[in-house]
Amino acid sequence: MNLKQKWDVYSRLTRLDRPIGTLLLMWPCLMALMLAAGGMPDLKVLIIFIIGVVIMRACGCIINDYADRDLDSFVERTKSRPLASGEISTKEALILFVVLGLSAFGLVLLLNGLVVKLSVVGIILTIIYPFTKRITNMPQMFLGVVWSWSIPMAYAAQTGEVPMEAWWLFAANWFWTVAYDTMYAMVDRDDDLKVGIKSTAILFGKYDRQIIGLFQIAALVCFIAAGWSAERGLLYGLGLLTFVGFSTYQQMLIFGRERAPCFKAFLNNNWAGLALFVGLGADYLI
């Protein structure tokens, strides 16, 4: 395997070729940094978190594919992943995971002690998550915690503490993550039932759209509470209104429960997150 082929394998293993996950992680993290700083966060902290999100997203993908390597080959969407297809060995994948994980931890060591402690919890959660799909019907709810963990870390890095405002944002992102990852799980539901992978899409069954809607509403309420705590104004409100518009569109897409529209609904959440981020940023700038 030449260098170009190796890069292609690593890129697919870490999902660098599919940045949607990184973006969905990035928007709430950047919002947390802005809210914690009351506007523009410290440049050093901002750079560390941007790089850290990219690295930890890659780590999460590697450990997820490692855990699912014997099942992914039976799922249409995942059968061509490098570990499932045998393009890379488990040893090489785990070495890459360790290297990236240590790199992320090295960045965290440039910040305060509270962030370091929270980061240890974060890496443990990241490792545990992929295995929850075998023992619980609600792995998306665990993923919501994993994908929201950068929020208390961001507040800790910027202010040295984690106030109630941070937990409102944490709750908002948790509800939102469960909603959009259930849409994602709807894409694989038929294959998951065959191989024994558990998900909220399977758990919710025929009530999936309604429950996703409830989670979207709960996310909105918590985003409002976070903004209220930070005394945000009209432009943040416009961002929230746009978020509602995207959520409504997603409900339309998943109405028929077909694979392609459900995946499109999942991808659309990137724009919902961007709308929230832009609304918050504009509210501080103008």
Curated annotation (Swiss-Prot):
Keyword Membrane: yes
Major localization listed first in the record, in broad terms: membrane
Topology with respect to the bilayer: Multi-pass membrane protein
TM helices/strands, residue ranges: 21-40, 95-115, 142-162, 167-187, 211-231, 235-255, 266-286
An annotated Gene Ontology molecular function: 4-hydroxybenzoate polyprenyltransferase activity
Cofactor(s) the record lists: Mg(2+)
CDD domains referenced in this protein's UniProt entry, alphabetically: PT_UbiA_COQ2
Reactions listed under catalytic activity: all-trans-octaprenyl diphosphate + 4-hydroxybenzoate = 4-hydroxy-3-(all-trans-octaprenyl)benzoate + diphosphate
GO biological process, one term: ubiquinone biosynthetic process
Keywords from the named record: Cell inner membrane, Cell membrane, Magnesium, Membrane, Transferase, Transmembrane, Transmembrane helix, Ubiquinone biosynthesis
Entry EC no(s): 2.5.1.39
Pathway as given in its UniProt record: Cofactor biosynthesis; ubiquinone biosynthesis
Function: Catalyzes the prenylation of para-hydroxybenzoate (PHB) with an all-trans polyprenyl group. Mediates the second step in the final reaction sequence of ubiquinone-8 (UQ-8) biosynthesis, which is the condensation of the polyisoprenoid side chain with PHB, generating the first membrane-bound Q intermediate 3-octaprenyl-4-hydroxybenzoate.
Family named by the database record: Belongs to the UbiA prenyltransferase family.
Protein name: 4-hydroxybenzoate octaprenyltransferase
Lineage: Bacteria, Pseudomonadati, Pseudomonadota, Gammaproteobacteria, Alteromonadales
